[in-house]
Regions:
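Cys/His-rich microdomains that often coordinate metals
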Residues: 12-13, 34, 252-254, 280
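Cysteine-rich micro-motifs
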Residues: 20-33, 265-279
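Short metal-binding segments enriched for Cys and/or His
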Residues: 31-42, 273-294
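Cys/His-enriched microdomains
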Residues: 3-6, 25, 244-247, 269-271
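Short, cysteine/histidine-rich loop/knuckle motifs that typically chelate Zn2+
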Residues: 7-10, 29, 247-248, 275
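Conserved RNase H-like, two-metal-ion catalytic cores of nucleic-acid enzymes
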Residues: 40-121
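Short Cys/His-rich "knuckle" micro-motifs
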Residues: 14-19, 37-40, 256-261, 283-286
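Metal-dependent phosphoesterase core characteristic of DEDDh/y 3'-5' exonuclease domains
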Residues: 47, 80-98, 123-229, 233-237
């Protein structure tokens, strides 16, 4: 339960820290600041941020040769399915994963592992993937609807591939390049035959596939943390936490710089997070207003 502002009786109040054993609050309507006993303090729930990656099978198609040709939908003889997935919660050492059994792989039956990844996506506030928006999530949604599954609860998406392409002029934007260049967790080497063997249901090869998948997720987390200070429009964690914190990492260790950010109408002091090093701005339209909200530039 959120406290009522003693001046305007609004419940639109925001936590501002602790003072002398009491919780400080700020009213977002009239800007009155007040304190309450610690009984009012709600548990601080850090947003559930999920990093994930999937591995898919091949499509099987028929044609009239190996030359360049357009494959039409009626030439598909076997549809694609999900071989494995891997995921981890941000900062959690535990990497979760699931892979089809040899029998499921031979039958191209991925419904069991679709249910397990669906549960994680349904819990998440934010999901992170490399090419996740264009590939992984669209593939999963197609498999969900193909198996008559309902969509998971809505979440925000951070696509590290889109971030890298938008913010940098690198020689390559593949995760394999980024992890090697920045000396992060490297992807494991694979070959095309691995996918053939997984479809054949060879147990050892299915284990190799999911291990490859798990390494991808560990590398993805490191890529995300490396790129994070440069991410514009990162989902505002302060909104999810209902706290006046760094919108990028959720920490409250902010230092005001001597610089300001200008728009056509206002100017804002720039703060830098001492944890993730991201520069942010705090709402402050003139010198008499006290900064109340931190957001990304």
């Amino acid at each position: 339960m959120r406290p009522v502002c003693p001046d305007c009786t609004s419940t639109h109040t925001r936590k501002k820290g602790i003072r002398r054993g009491n919780q400080r609050w700020s009213c977002t309507q009239c800007r009155r600041q007040f304190t309450t006993p610690m009984d009012y303090v709600e548990e601080n729930k850090f947003p559930k941020i999920l990093l994930f990656d999937i591995e898919t099978s091949l499509y099987h198609m028929v044609g009239w040769g190996t030359y360049k040709q357009y494959i039409q939908h009626h030439q598909i003889t076997k549809h694609q399915y999900i071989i494995s997935w891997a995921a981890k919660w941000l900062y959690d050492d535990n990497v979760q994963s699931d892979v089809v059994t040899p029998k499921e792989s031979k039958n191209r039956d991925d419904k069991r592992i679709l249910k397990s990844i669906w549960k994680l996506l349904d819990e998440a506030d934010i999901v992170i993937g490399h090419n996740g928006e264009r590939f992984d999530l669209r593939k999963l949604r197609w498999r969900f609807i193909s198996e008559n599954m309902q969509p998971p609860s809505p979440f925000r998406v951070i696509d590290t591939l889109k971030v890298a392409r938008r913010e940098f002029f690198a020689p390559s934007y593949k995760q394999d390049f980024l992890t090697k260049y920045f000396k992060l967790e490297n992807k494991l080497s694979t070959e095309f035959q691995l996918w053939i063997d997984c479809e054949a249901g060879i147990p050892k090869r299915l284990e190799e596939m999911v291990e490859y998948n798990r390494h991808d997720v560990m590398g993805l987390e490191q890529v995300y943390l490396k790129l994070r200070p440069y991410m514009r429009n990162h989902p505002n964690l302060g909104v999810l936490m209902d706290e006046d914190v760094c919108p990028t990492c959720g920490e409250n260790d902010l230092t005001e710089t001597n610089n300001e950010y200008f728009t056509s109408a206002n100017r804002f002091p720039i703060y830098r997070c001492n944890n993730c090093k991201t520069p942010n701005i705090r709402s402050k339209k003139n010198s008499n207003d006290k900064g109340t909200e931190v957001r990304s530039i």
